[in-house]
């Protein structure tokens, strides 16, 4: 089992880092193309990415988790994949309409001024029109992982990212499409990933069914209950970006927002690593839970937490020893004010990952063992409630530094709450495991 765990986690982390490169590649090339204004635009757009990814993750990962549990119990799962893709496409329709008709208003709502709207209009339009691909991408990769093919999901994600990096440059500079070129490359990226995942679905090792069944709200809700933690995990970056952008605009203006853009984009990689760890362990935990193997479930949780702590230590080492080097990647103009803001921000903000990684693993664990209550509470606390409250209060008390440190405060509150709820429900959990073992 340790070999399987290592393989699943390693490949899932690699795949998630690949997905995070969607935004990082844009950030790098856009910073070269238009400097601090480009960074500010992209950072204002991050909440849009967050919401799109969140809905796609809730439907795709939730459906794949329910698929793994149901299949382990011997239930019919032939329609799960098609239902997931169908609901993903339906959920994407409002985003497409906004992209076609009112991209300017969407940017204004996110806090962009006239200059930034003019710079980012076409980029937002392209991204929103491509929403069905972004959302469905989660279904393709999550079902592949839960069907015993994490390597295919990883290769798909990395292939998409490589395409994005290469064609970001080609579309923006040689072709001369500028900002729009970055959006076009990013929009095609998930299509590449899904095409690679299709290799597994057409192979003899595939167990995923493709039977059509009328879309069912009951089935959707059942799956989304297990995908809420993934939803909030993805949405949290968007919520944090919105709250931080408005708070920072009032304290440090556009340059402060640009500095947060550097911090936020580097944090995407850290979140991707922990989400990859959680999503890599999830299929194995769900499988063991569905088969009534509590000892195996606990062992998988311990391994996940151990890896999490090791990664957290490594991240802190990199951040504190290479702060200015990391910032320089996105500071093509060598702006001193941007460097000063981002230097302090990066170090203080990343202290939150000391606890954030553990919370991500715990939330995914409770979803994997069909305990949506703890997963949902933990997800909403760390992704929305606690971070918003802490950011607003600490910003008033300590200004910009208070905003940077709010992630650590919010994650600490979440961790203590999860521990309390887990301890409170421990007897119910023991009874449920006993009933599973007797089946």
Sequence positions of predicted segments:
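Short runs within selected transmembrane alpha-helices of multi-pass transporters and secretion channels
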Residues: 60, 126-145, 153-161, 182-197, ...
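Short alpha-helical transmembrane segments in multi-pass integral membrane proteins
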Residues: 1-13, 67-130, 177-228, 285-352, ...
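Transmembrane helical elements of multi-pass membrane transporters/channels
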Residues: 7-26, 126, 137, 160, ...
């Amino acid at each position: 089992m340790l070999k399987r765990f290592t393989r699943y986690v390693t490949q899932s982390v690699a795949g998630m880092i690949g997905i995070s490169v969607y935004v990082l590649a844009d950030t790098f090339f856009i910073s070269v193309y238009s400097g601090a204004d480009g960074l500010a635009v992209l950072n204002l757009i991050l909440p849009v990415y967050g919401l799109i990814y969140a809905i796609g993750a809730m439907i795709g990962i939730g459906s794949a988790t329910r698929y793994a549990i149901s299949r382990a119990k011997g239930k019919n799962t032939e329609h799960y994949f098609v239902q997931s893709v169908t609901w993903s496409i339906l959920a994407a329709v409002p985003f497409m309409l906004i992209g076609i008709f009112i991209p300017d208003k969407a940017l204004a709502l996110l806090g962009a001024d006239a200059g930034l709207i003019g710079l980012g209009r076409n980029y937002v339009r392209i991204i929103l029109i491509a929403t069905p691909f972004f959302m469905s991408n989660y279904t393709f990769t999550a079902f592949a992982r839960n069907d015993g093919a994490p390597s295919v999901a990883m290769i798909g994600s990395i292939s998409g990212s490589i395409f994005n990096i290469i064609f970001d440059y080609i579309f923006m500079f040689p072709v001369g499409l500028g900002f729009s070129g970055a959006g076009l490359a990013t929009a095609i990226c998930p299509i590449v990933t899904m095409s690679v995942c299709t290799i597994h679905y057409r192979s003899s090792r595939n167990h995923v069914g493709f039977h059509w069944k009328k879309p069912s709200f009951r089935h959707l809700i059942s799956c989304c209950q297990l995908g809420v933690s993934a939803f909030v995990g993805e949405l949290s970056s968007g919520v944090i970006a919105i709250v931080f952008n408005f708070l920072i605009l009032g304290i440090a203006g556009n340059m402060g927002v640009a500095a947060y853009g550097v911090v936020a984009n580097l944090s995407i990689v850290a979140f991707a690593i922990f989400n990859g760890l959680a999503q890599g362990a999830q299929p194995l935990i769900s499988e063991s839970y569905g088969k009534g193997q509590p000892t195996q479930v606990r062992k998988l949780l311990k391994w996940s937490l151990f890896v999490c702590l090791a990664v957290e230590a490594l991240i802190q080492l990199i951040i504190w020893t290479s702060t200015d080097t990391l910032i320089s990647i996105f500071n093509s103009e060598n702006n001193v004010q941007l460097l000063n803001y981002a230097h302090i921000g990066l170090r203080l903000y990343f202290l939150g990952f000391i606890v954030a990684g553990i919370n991500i693993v715990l939330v995914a664990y409770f979803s994997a063992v069909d305990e949506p209550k703890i997963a949902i509470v933990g997800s909403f606390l760390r992704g929305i409630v606690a971070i918003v409250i802490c950011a607003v209060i600490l910003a008033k008390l300590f200004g910009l530094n208070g905003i940077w440190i709010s992630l650590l405060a919010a994650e600490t509150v979440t961790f203590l709450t999860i521990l309390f709820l887990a301890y409170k429900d421990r007897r119910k959990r023991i009874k449920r495991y006993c009933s599973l073992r007797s089946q």
